[in-house]
Amino acid sequence: MKRFASRVLPKSLLVHRANKHAIMSFAESVGLVYFGHVSQRDDDDQLIRGLTLSTSHRDRHYCVGSLYNYDVALVERSDTIHYPGKQPRDHQWLIMQFDLHNAKDLPHIFLGLHTHSDIFYANLFAKFTTLQRAPLGTFGMYDRSFTDRYAIYTTPAESLTVERLFDTEMTKVLAQHFGTLTVEVSDGCLYLYSEHTRITKGLLEAMLQNGIWLAKHIDERAVVL
């Protein structure tokens, strides 16, 4: 019967069902509450914000809870990115948000992959006009395992603060464990993004583990900056 169903159902629906099962299973195992679909017309407090927030995005598999002393939210978000002179491009993100304790005054920071599309970065810089690539290396040489994969973007006036926060040793560890995850710090929250089409419980567990580690690091470092 399952083989017959897989022949009949569209691949996109099969992926959606598998992703839903993975997220619900993960949520149950760690103690998150699963709400499913969230409309943009709902209370703004329920929305996961960050750089992917738009007037056209669609959210599903929304989960919330408190884990390891952090308020955590999870959502699968899809959107079509438009930019003048470029072909529209569909994006789908798995987003995990952590409410930070000591980072209310930190600048907007994005750790982006070099492999992001041109339209993604064009849209990002149009939306956040103060973001620029930080010139790393003031306090030491960054490991190539990090710089070959990531660049850090922030407001130019805050680049030294960002280098102290994301220093050479910390970014080396990040490069070893984060794979293709990207990172944003904005308005007192930490966001981890994955663009894996197929969501697995292992991916979700890795995002949670890495997110808690990074949130603790940011909170500890923010106190002395």
Residue ranges and their predicted role:
Residues 2-18, 25, 196-198:
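Terminal, regulation- and interaction-focused segments at domain boundaries
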Residues 1-2, 185:
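Short, compositionally biased low-complexity segments
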Residues 20-225:
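Charged, low-complexity intrinsically disordered regions
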